[in-house]
Amino acid sequence: MVDNLPPLEPSLQNLVEQESLKWIFVGGKGGVGKTTCSSSLAVQLSKVRESVLIISTDPAHNISDAFDQKFTKVPTKVNGFDNLFAMEIDPNAGLGELPDEYFEGENEALRVSKGVMQEMINALPGIDEAMSYAEVMKLVKGMNFSVVVFDTAPTGHTLRLIAFPQVVEKGLGKLLRLKMKLAPLLSQFVSMLGMADVNADTLSQKLDDMLRVITQVNEQFKNPDQTTFVCVCIAEFFSLYETERLVQELTKCGIDVHNIIVNQLLFLDKSHNSCSMCASRFKIQEKYLDQIADLYEDFHVTKLPLLEKEVRGPESIKSFSENLMIPYKPKE
């Protein structure tokens, strides 16, 4: 009987031990501690993987604050680690705002102007943001990190990030089907811009390469052995509602999700008197924890504490990350 099965391990140990995983997304409603959780997961992964990259796709770029180190649009080693890297990208930025490293070829003849790429995709509504993600993914795949953790923006941006391979595949597919008709026009266009080294074949090759990478990424995103999503929430109505909506959307997109983190929990000693505010909050969270247990009985549900001090800096994150592996128990 299924009902007699023991509950799943209340930790992220299953993810850390799953060597086949390539992409791990961490997301949820704003203000629930996604960055702390994603940074902590990246730290734990760095103990068992050869190289780990954490990417922030949240415009707030909180991982710089979390690790107390400034990160950029290019992977940078995190202080205090040999194999953990971090980078921040703006999900609202288009191709024109990506750094030159993303567009460099082996020589000048293979270098494709950002301006030309921008002009080409402007005719495809909604693809600019997706193409920005696509260039980032192409760069990241080329660096062969063992696993990539995404610290995502609040839910709306997250769902667009998940869907970007399909958007790019559709858009580039249209361009490539038209490339024979476009070739003379593109040649004239780049000639007018004074870029003799860039021709229609070069642009076409660039798009072909991009499409090949994105098709592979799309396949990997749909493969539960390679991609999974970790939902972070707090024990309150709106956060739980958003989490359920996110789980349903991820399921529609074919993205694996079987881990939920419930963050910022009060762990009260019932044998001692607590302040009335703490007792009230504890009662509320107990109510929603019961609902979470009912809704997600086939999920790994990890419970993390609300701390007196903020989690900031490499050492603080290292310490907090242990709670992802061993269920938290308050000190006696």
Swiss-Prot record:
One GO term of the biological process aspect: tail-anchored membrane protein insertion into ER membrane
Enzyme class: hydrolase
Active site (catalytic residues): 58
Residues annotated to bind ATP: 29-36, 236, 263
Keyword Cytoplasm recorded: yes
A single GO cellular-component term on record: GET complex
Record flagged with keyword Transport: yes
Binding site for Zn(2+): 275, 278
Entry EC number(s): 3.6.-.-
Subcellular location: Cytoplasm; Endoplasmic reticulum
Pfam family, one: ArsA_ATPase
One of the record's GO molecular function terms: ATP hydrolysis activity
UniProt keyword terms in alphabetical order: ATP-binding, Cytoplasm, Endoplasmic reticulum, Hydrolase, Metal-binding, Nucleotide-binding, Transport, Zinc
InterPro entries: Anion-transp_ATPase-like_dom, ATPase_ArsA/GET3, ATPase_ArsA/GET3_euk, P-loop_NTPase
Assembly behavior: Homodimer.
Stated role: ATPase required for the post-translational delivery of tail-anchored (TA) proteins to the endoplasmic reticulum. Recognizes and selectively binds the transmembrane domain of TA proteins in the cytosol. This complex then targets to the endoplasmic reticulum by membrane-bound receptors, where the tail-anchored protein is released for insertion. This process is regulated by ATP binding and hydrolysis. ATP binding drives the homodimer towards the closed dimer state, facilitating recognition of newly synthesized TA membrane proteins. ATP hydrolysis is required for insertion.
Family recorded in the similarity comment: Belongs to the arsA ATPase family.
Record-given protein name: ATPase ASNA1 homolog
